[in-house]
Amino acid sequence: MSDIRKELKYLSSHEWARVEEDGTVTIGITDHAQDALGDVVYVETPEVGSRVSLGEEAGVVESVKAASDIYSLVSGKVVAVNELLQDAPETVNSSPYDEGWFFRVQPDDVSELDEALSADEYRELLESEE
């Protein structure tokens, strides 16, 4: 079974979000997503200073098997991107929740995360897909 962390929020498209102590929201793809994709070879993130919107495409992750859009769990301004992924995209495979995050957003309204799936709801989604 995939690693599903209790403190995170999830989308059915397999992205996760974590609210940081400074109020920003970090976004990446789940352990299930990286496993399904296989070896990640390229990550395209939004630019710092750009705006992302809840549920809209914000980037792309490519693997040896497929390419997949990355969606944001909140609307807001991108305040950081994970530069490590430019030179080491495989970090998404080895550490999807820690070193393999994609970008950070200063959310317009953090309560948008209330619409996202809890860890238990995400687990149920994965079980229903099996």
Curated annotation (Swiss-Prot):
Entries under InterPro entries matching the protein: 2-oxoA_DH_lipoyl-BS, Biotin_lipoyl, GCV_H, GCV_H/Fam206, GCV_H_sub, Single_hybrid_motif
Modified residues (N6-lipoyllysine): K65
S-S bridge residues: none
Pfam family, one: GCV_H
Assigned GO CC terms: cytosol; glycine cleavage complex
Keyword annotations of the record: Lipoyl
GO biological process, one term: glycine decarboxylation via glycine cleavage system
SUPFAM superfamilies reported in the protein's UniProt record: Single hybrid motif (SSF51230)
Domain of life: Bacteria
Residue stretches making up the Lipoyl-binding domain: 24-106
Cofactor note: Binds 1 lipoyl cofactor covalently.
Cofactor(s) named in the record: (R)-lipoate
Residues passing through the membrane, by range: none
Subunit structure: The glycine cleavage system is composed of four proteins: P, T, L and H.
Family note: Belongs to the GcvH family.
Function: The glycine cleavage system catalyzes the degradation of glycine. The H protein shuttles the methylamine group of glycine from the P protein to the T protein.
Protein name: Glycine cleavage system H protein
Species whose genome carries this gene: Cellvibrio japonicus (strain Ueda107) (Pseudomonas fluorescens subsp. cellulosa)
Gene coding for it: gcvH
